């Protein structure tokens, strides 16, 4: 049984008994974090788990991978998971439906999205509207952040997402296969899939680098229910503290972080993993201290609003709570 199957099966077995977002065993607690894809982009979170930063507060963290557009968010709303990692725009979507979620610590501070052209389809200039018109783009499912960024950029480039291009919306991990099978000429992808596609000669190096083009971006934050903050702030604080320590360790000791990545992605060739991590460090993918800046949400908000996915202007303080990051910062 592979890791993902194990996680899904154990989560399913435990679903009936998980009425609250954590399970208490005396002083120890076990919490589940839902992720939309198992990605090197979330390395600081895996580092925090591997290094025992959550365990320092008697918290055990398990990862549940749910590859549907809003599945990771729904896992938190239903109480199956304590937190999800993903864009805080999902908190805004939930708020529009009457639910209250809060982003409490940052992870990915850049839009972890790269546009790659299939071999033989590479652009010759930088007029992206003219280049992309008439092409098929493989991208994550509607509601996922890569999909939102794509719709935002298409509008910026004066292209209609329905009539000027074809969006082949699939799971994040399936984008590479779609381009490889020639169902799309463009792959909208993240690491480690970008490097894998380059190594397999499916596509060339990215022609459009979102981390560099859009700058600070609230791309992947750790998000919890508001009632978790209200009912058990110490658990939230312990979780935030562990994440901040994971972020700091990743930047301070990249070689040691890479060793943890090897264990998380054991089937990935080492040269692919190295190239993936090199790109992530070069693009300053991760937050350095867990802070979600107002500028980062301004960009994230603009993306989902201009893409037509979020209809209302949701303010920073309505979906983001930095009080826990601020409270642990002085002690780290």
Each language-model region and where it sits:
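Short, solvent-exposed loop/beta-turn-alpha elements that line the ligand-binding surface or hinge
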Residues: 56, 130, 211-213, 282-293
């Amino acid at each position: 049984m592979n890791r993902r199957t194990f996680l899904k099966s154990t989560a399913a077995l435990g679903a009936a008994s998980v009425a609250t977002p954590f399970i208490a065993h005396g002083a120890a607690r076990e919490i589940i974090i839902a992720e939309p894809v198992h990605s090197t982009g979330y390395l600081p979170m895996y580092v925090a788990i591997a290094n025992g930063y959550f365990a320092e507060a008697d918290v055990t963290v398990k990862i549940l991978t749910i590859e549907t557009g809003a599945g990771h968010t729904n896992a938190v709303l239903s109480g199956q998971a304590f937190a999800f990692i993903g864009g805080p725009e999902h908190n805004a979507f939930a708020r529009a439906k009457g639910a209250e979620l809060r982003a409490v610590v940052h992870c990915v501070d850049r839009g972890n999205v790269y546009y790659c052209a299939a071999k033989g389809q590479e652009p010759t200039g930088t007029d992206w509207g003219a280049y992309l018109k008439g092409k098929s783009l493989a991208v994550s499912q509607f509601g996922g952040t890569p999909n939102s960024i794509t719709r935002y950029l298409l509008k910026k480039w004066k292209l209609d997402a329905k009539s000027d291009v074809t969006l082949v919306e699939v799971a994040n991990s399936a984008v590479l296969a779609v381009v490889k099978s020639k169902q799309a000429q463009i792959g909208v992808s993240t690491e480690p899939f970008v490097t894998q596609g380059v190594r397999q000669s499916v596509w060339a190096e990215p022609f459009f680098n979102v981390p560099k083009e859009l700058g600070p971006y609230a791309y992947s934050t750790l998000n919890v229910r508001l009632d978790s903050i209200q009912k058990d702030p110490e658990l939230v604080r312990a979780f935030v503290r562990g994440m901040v320590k994971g972020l700091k360790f990743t930047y301070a000791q990249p070689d040691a972080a890479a060793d943890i990545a090897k264990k998380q992605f054991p089937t990935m060739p080492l040269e692919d993993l190295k190239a993936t991590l090199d790109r992530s460090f070069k693009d300053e993918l991760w937050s350095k201290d867990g802070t979600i800046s107002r500028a980062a949400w301004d960009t994230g908000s603009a993306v989902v609003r201009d893409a037509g996915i979020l209809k209302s202007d949701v303010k920073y303080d309505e979906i983001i709570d930095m009080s826990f990051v601020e409270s642990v910062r002085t002690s780290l």
